UniProtKB/Swiss-Prot annotation:
Belongs to the peptidase M48B family. The active site is at E140. It is a multi-pass membrane protein. This is Protease HtpX. The keyword Transmembrane applies. The chain crosses the membrane at residues 4-24, 33-53, 147-167, 197-217. Its cofactor is Zn(2+). Zn(2+) binds at H139, H143, E223. It comes from the Bacteria. One of its GO terms (cellular component) is plasma membrane. Signal peptide: none annotated. Binds 1 zinc ion per subunit.
């Protein structure tokens, strides 16, 4: 789940920064069409920036060490396993990194299939059998080969666009509703007021949280398909065994920004705010071969 939350938070931060820049510079949208265009540019802009910086953000958020020249048996095994699985998935071998954490986890990120990163926790390497670890790695390889990073970027871009557009339209309506200068209700002069600025920023945060429900729904679906992809590479019994091992371990100790791209996510008070389906549901889907290619 780490991956998606980092992605969402980065997007939200970029949108807020864009909003501050627009307010300071006094740039206004003189029409609804102009506002739609501006919302789309900044909405997708934030999403694309998040994607382009995803590897850098991921590496630094967990202090991961990229393996360029394997120095021991574990690193050699990890490097060779990911290289072999990448060939089976018809993608370029991603950069490989290890980060120090007790939890059993791994995540994949990157701007495109042939320029990706897979990071693995020391907890995974120390506590999983090779068959279980291979299943986890195949899960991350499937995320890359399925183009999940691009998919989530497009989804987030659309979500961002609606968040920006609605927050500004509603903010203008609220400001004009309480404005004493009714002659300017049809203009966008209200965009220069501090009240408009704070209301629009607050609405962006609120709508951003609500919109994350959509993002999380897509993320949960992608997890099912990544599990199925792993099962096709290493066998569903190995993937089920890996999930059962993960179920009995602690939650991932990583930044919120990367949670969605981990093999395991964090629990929430409600499933709609979870980037990963409950592990029991994932195991059941594998048993039924629900998301596997027929």
């Amino acid at each position: 789940m780490m991956r998606i939350l980092l992605f969402i938070l980065t997007n939200l931060s970029v949108m807020i920064i864009f909003g501050i820049i627009l307010f300071i510079t006094g740039i206004k949208s003189s029409s609804s069409f102009g506002l739609i265009i501006m919302s789309g540019v900044f909405g997708f802009g934030g999403s694309i920036i998040s994607l382009l910086l995803s590897k850098y953000i991921a590496i630094n958020s967990v202090n991961a060490k990229i393996i360029k020249n394997p120095k021991n048996d574990i690193e050699n095994w990890l490097f060779n396993t990911i290289k072999l699985q990448s060939q089976k998935a018809n993608i370029g071998t991603p950069d490989i990194a290890i980060y120090d954490a007790e939890d059993i986890n791994a995540f994949a990120t990157g701007p495109k299939k042939n320029s990706a990163l897979i990071a693995v926790s020391t907890g995974l390497l120390n506590n999983m059998s090779k068959k279980e670890a291979e299943a986890v790695l195949a899960h991350e390889i499937s995320h890359i080969s399925n183009g999940d990073m691009i998919t989530m970027t497009l989804i987030q871009g659309v979500v961002n666009t609606f968040v920006i557009f609605l927050s500004r339209v509603i903010s203008k309506f609220i400001v004009n509703l309480f404005s004493t200068n009714k002659e300017d209700e049809n203009s966008y002069e209200s965009e220069n007021s501090w009240s408009y600025f704070f209301i629009s920023m607050a609405l962006e945060v609120v709508f951003g949280i609500l919109a994350s429900i959509i993002t999380f729904w897509f993320s949960r679906k992608r997890e099912f398909y990544a599990d199925a992809g792993s099962a096709e590479i290493v066998g569903k019994n190995n993937m089920i065994a890996a999930l059962q091992k993960i179920k009995n371990t602690c939650e991932p100790n990583v930044g919120k920004e990367l949670l969605a791209f981990c093999i395991n996510g964090k629990k929430s008070f409600n499933e709609i705010f979870m980037s990963h389906p409950p592990i029991d549901k994932r195991i059941q889907a594998l048993i039924q071969e629900k998301y596997m290619k027929k």
